[in-house]
UniProtKB/Swiss-Prot annotation:
<dbReference type="InterPro" id="IPR012337">
    <property type="entry name" value="RNaseH-like_sf"/>
</dbReference>
<dbReference type="InterPro" id="IPR006172">
    <property type="entry name" value="DNA-dir_DNA_pol_B"/>
</dbReference>
<dbReference type="GO" id="GO:0046872">
    <property type="term" value="F:metal ion binding"/>
</dbReference>
<feature type="binding site">
    <location>
        <position position="116"/>
    </location>
    <ligand>
        <name>Mg(2+) 1</name>
    </ligand>
</feature>
<dbReference type="InterPro" id="IPR006133">
    <property type="entry name" value="DNA-dir_DNA_pol_B_exonuc"/>
</dbReference>
<keyword id="KW-0460">Magnesium</keyword>
<feature type="binding site">
    <location>
        <position position="327"/>
    </location>
    <ligand>
        <name>Mg(2+) 1</name>
    </ligand>
</feature>
<feature type="binding site">
    <location>
        <position position="411"/>
    </location>
    <ligand>
        <name>Mg(2+) 3</name>
    </ligand>
</feature>
<comment type="similarity">
    <text>Belongs to the DNA polymerase type-B family.</text>
</comment>
<feature type="binding site">
    <location>
        <position position="412"/>
    </location>
    <ligand>
        <name>Mg(2+) 4</name>
    </ligand>
</feature>
<dbReference type="InterPro" id="IPR017964">
    <property type="entry name" value="DNA-dir_DNA_pol_B_CS"/>
</dbReference>
<feature type="site" description="Optimization of metal coordination by the polymerase active site">
    <location>
        <position position="706"/>
    </location>
</feature>
<keyword id="KW-0235">DNA replication</keyword>
<dbReference type="InterPro" id="IPR050240">
    <property type="entry name" value="DNA_pol_type-B"/>
</dbReference>
<feature type="binding site">
    <location>
        <position position="411"/>
    </location>
    <ligand>
        <name>Mg(2+) 4</name>
    </ligand>
</feature>
<keyword id="KW-0238">DNA-binding</keyword>
<dbReference type="InterPro" id="IPR036397">
    <property type="entry name" value="RNaseH_sf"/>
</dbReference>
């Protein structure tokens, strides 16, 4: 096997690298790296190096990194450009690994850990680390073992050893229900004192030093607490042993929520899983506690316990250790589903960067472009900062709030990346500018063609067509990767639907799941075999298909994010290739493209349907248009269709054979009009939506921009056995909406779209009765605890105090002096409940940390005084009124004169 790096650090004048050698063994080396940089030279001078603008450059080799850095400063002082990669870690990786890196993830030691600290005086502050660490669970990916370090004797009480036998038992049998699949992987180590525990953990750490260190919120809590605790007990030099290079950096980060200490352990890549989840999951959650996210992702939360966590070790030490183990296991389970660690490795090795740099699109793209240009002997420009300036955003069409029975949507493939490639937008391809006409003149093709020579964008920018830009070239590579992974995702999705169909009539035989590659569409032979499988085998295959779909979805979405982040980087003042003109060219072209095709689609469908001036495009947003298909169905006659599948088939065929070619012709005209380098505006049919044939359902509705719901039968060629709701921007999607209300509103929408007004009214009556019986947490609204101090006047709300901040202040007064009650942390989410007048808390609401039960100290009073009427009105009825008003429906049956009679 070829060598590949694990971590790389610059310490002084040396590069310290951990790597896997050709024999598959982990090694460490210190390299006195000699970097190269570049300067412009006269055109008469012979050289093989040129900058991205074609200017000749001369290479300068330095004896060490210090000399190179000093040369850059001298060049800046005299106003000359020092070209080349000034991040010497990236330059070293490029020089050392001048080939595509094929890494073996089984050789990369990933540690997932969690510590427990008993603190009798509130939250244990990691920067102080004044309380003993009394439990550590550390999972090692290479060993596939959970190493548990347990402190038996501490200042806060002595405890008995944890029992693996009790841990394995069901809770009804007095056990902890630690899953059977990990019981045999647990290595339990009890210690009599903390010094012994920490020293043994440190020795273990050095023997099995992580390459990737993860866990839930480890960067903010676990890592600084362990580091500072070891420093407090043994001294700083001992704490630095956590770094394989004995080098650490302590950094205090200040933000609107206060300050926190970040410890960098040189030689270890920290990928805090809470940060991975926030960046890559594309979900907005009401709480990012591990318990909440576990419930959301796995349908199982953390291990439950009675009383405050600060008392758990003393009251139930057995549960305390099992709780610690399960916390680590939950993060492993989430990653098994989401694959964010593997995704980070893929991105990191593709770009040849430190793996933790995947959080920075600027760093990622800087490395990708540098490595590509280096192969061509092209030299990257010097990075400079620029003043921040705004530029236009995307176009969003204002919809008419209404119900829409039959709808088709069409989506431009990777709009901004495609614009960059079509127009050939790059810093070095700028050819000049032309006199700009109003944007609507370009949309309607009444303005003069901008240029017969150069590729143009309607913001006035012109680009060369006779050369490939650096940015379009690199984006094309990642674009092709995204297309590949999206193909895997959609194939797995289609395969999953085939398996679901077979599950309606499974075989009773005893068999095994088929060994197939779910990334590719099943052959006819496999489809026939699937029909003969048992339910057990089919369910196993469905599980694998869904995992493949999730892996493909994550990979393609994150490549999409990477691609689109390059567009954003072009407008980022810290990016090496920053140019405001280019960022503006991209978004302005996008605005024109969407409105151009709206005009073309309306013209085409008016011609097909024999109408005049009809606005068939009801909505558009950034890269998508939504087309009302009612008149298309009417043209054929709704009665002609046998069933729902029949009309979906018809619209599918109409979109594929008639509309997509018409759309393509329209975009080709635009490409010719703008004289672009190549035609890449490809718009495909996305959703086909409508009610079941013969039902009273409305099919879909819009309440405003970015707020709509559709009953979808087919998405990008994947036909659903049961329709799926596509809901955007409505309260069902908002993290502030209570969980139970989200579910109820979604059911209301389903009934509106699929069954109609009468069904909606029935459910409204049901939920109104059910609401008061629901668990208080499931109906509490959620808000972020921002700017508490701003509105805090002696513990009471000041002028213009927001409702949820008022609730936080109420809570703080109620728990004052009680250190066991969970504290509200600035910036975190809180649950909010309204209270009836006359309550003992003296205010109209109360709020406490989300993801937790309200403290027993005040729970009974809160539940007695909570205002169900206000809560139902604000969280459920008000948003439902918005839906039904737009859709011209009534959620409650209205009395009429006819109700007085029997007929």
């Amino acid at each position: 096997m070829k060598e590949f790096y694990l971590t790389v650090e610059q310490i002084g004048d040396s590069i310290f690298e951990r790597y896997i050698d050709s024999n598959g063994r982990e090694r460490t080396r210190e390299v006195e790296y000699k970097p190269s940089l570049f300067a412009h030279c006269p055109e008469s001078q012979a050289t093989k190096y040129f900058d991205i603008y074609g200017k000749p450059c001369t290479r300068k080799l330095f004896a060490n990194m210090r000399d190179a850095s000093q040369w850059i400063k001298r060049m800046e002082d005299i106003g000359l450009e020092a070209l080349g990669m000034d991040d010497f870690k990236l330059a070293y990786l490029s020089d050392t690994y001048n080939y595509e890196i094929k890494y073996d993830h089984t050789k990369i030691r990933v540690a997932n850990f969690d510590i427990e600290v008993t603190s009798p005086d509130g939250f244990p502050e990691p920067s102080q680390a004044k309380h003993p660490i009394d439990a550590i669970t550390h999972y090692d990916s290479i060993d596939d073992r959970f190493y548990v370090f347990d402190l038996l004797n501490s200042p806060y009480g002595n405890v008995e050893e944890w029992s693996i036998e009790i841990a394995a038992k069901l809770q009804e049998q007095g056990g902890d229900e630690v899953p059977s699949e990990i019981i045999d992987k647990i290595i339990y180590m009890p210690f009599d004192n903390e010094k012994e525990l920490l020293m043994e953990y440190l020795n273990f750490w050095q023997q099995k030093t992580p390459v990737i260190l993860t866990g839930w919120n480890v960067e903010s809590f676990d890592i600084p607490y362990v580091y500072n605790r070891i420093k407090n007990i043994f001294g700083e030099s001992t704490a630095k042993r956590l770094s394989p290079h004995r080098k650490t950096r302590v950094k205090v980060i200040e933000n609107m929520y206060g300050s926190r200490e970040i410890i960098t352990l040189f030689g270890i890549s920290v990928l805090d899983y809470i940060d991975l989840y926030k960046k890559f999951s594309f979900t907005n959650q009401p709480s990012y506690s591990l318990d909440y996210i576990s419930e959301f992702e796995l349908n199982v939360g953390k291990l439950k316990y009675d009383g405050p966590i600060s008392k758990l070790r003393e009251s139930n030490h057995q549960r305390y250790i099992s709780y610690n183990i399960i916390d680590v296991y939950r993060v492993l389970q989430i990653d098994a589903k989401r694959q964010f660690i593997n995704l980070s490795l893929d991105m990191g090795y593709y770009a040849k960067i430190q793996i933790q740099s995947v959080f920075s699109p600027i760093k990622t793209w800087d490395a990708i472009i540098f490595n590509s240009l280096k192969e061509q002997n092209k030299v990257i420009p010097q990075g400079r900062s620029h003043p921040v300036q705004p530029y236009p955003g995307a176009f969003v069409k204002e919809p008419i709030p209404n119900r829409y029975k039959y709808v088709m949507s069409f989506d431009l493939t990777s709009l901004y990346p495609s614009i960059i490639r079509q127009v050939n937008i790059s810093p070095e391809t700028i050819a000049g500018t032309f006199k700009v006409a109003p944007l609507h003149d370009y949309i309607n093709a009444v303005a003069e063609r901008p240029s017969d020579v150069y590729s143009c964008s309607p913001n006035g920018m012109m680009y060369y067509k006779d050369r490939d830009g650096v940015v379009p070239t690199e984006i094309t590579k990642v674009f092709n990767q995204r297309k590949e992974h999206k193909g895997y995702m959609l194939a797995a999705q289609r395969n999953g639907e085939i398996i679901k169909e077979a599950l309606h009539n499974p075989n009773l035989s005893v068999d095994e799941p088929l060994d197939v590659d779910y990334r590719f569409d099943f052959s006819d032979e496999i489809k026939e075999k699937i029909k003969k499988l048992s339910a057990k085998s089919l369910n196993e295959m469905l599980f694998r298909a869904q995992r493949t779909e999730v892996a493909g979805m994550t990979a393609q979405i994150n490549r999409k994010l990477l691609i689109n982040s390059l567009y954003g980087a072009l407008g980022n003042v810290w990016f090496r290739y920053y140019d405001l003109r280019n960022a503006t060219a991209i978004t302005t072209f996008g605005q024109m493209a969407l409105q151009w095709i709206e005009r073309k689609v309306n013209e085409y469908l008016n011609e097909v349907c024999g109408t005049e001036g009809e606005a068939f495009v009801l909505y558009g947003d950034t890269d998508s248009i939504y087309v009302s298909a009612d008149k298309i169905i009417d043209k054929v006659g709704e009665s002609k269709f046998r069933d729902t599948n029949h009309w979906v088939d018809f619209l599918d065929k109409f979109a594929r054979e008639r509309m997509e070619p018409a759309i393509d012709r329209g975009f080709r005209e635009m490409c010719e009009y703008m004289n672009n380098k190549q035609h890449l505006m490809f718009m495909d049919r996305e959703a086909i939506a409508g009610p079941p044939l013969g039902s009273k359902g409305i099919g879909g509705f819009w309440t405003g921009k970015k707020r709509y719901a559709l009953n979808v039968w087919d998405m990008e060629g994947t036909r659903y056995a049961e329709p799926k709701l596509k809901i955007m921007g409505l309260e069902t999607q908002k993290s502030s909406t209570p969980k139970a209300v989200q579910k109820a509103l979604k059911e209301c929408i389903r009934r509106m779209l699929q069954e109609g007004e009468e069904s909606l009214q029935e459910y409204f009556k049901e939920f109104e009765k059910e609401f008061r019986q629901l668990n208080y947490i499931s109906i509490a609204s959620v808000s972020s605890a921002n700017n508490i101090a701003k509105y805090d006047v002696g513990g009471f709300p000041g002028p213009k105090c927001p409702f949820h901040i008022r609730g936080i202040l109420t809570y703080n007064r109620a728990i004052k002096g009680n250190i066991d009650a969970p504290q509200v942390v600035e910036g975190e989410k809180v649950y909010v409940l309204p209270l009836r007048e006359g309550n003992p808390f003296g205010d109209k609401c109360i709020a406490w940390p989300s993801g937790t039960e309200i403290t027993d100290l005040i729970k009974d009073d809160v539940l007695h005084w909570m205002d169900y009427t206000v809560l139902l009105e604000k969280t459920f009825i008000k948003p439902l009124e918005g839906f039904t008003s737009a859709a011209k429906l009534d959620y409650e049956k209205k009395a009429s004169l006819f109700d007085m009679f029997d007929f």
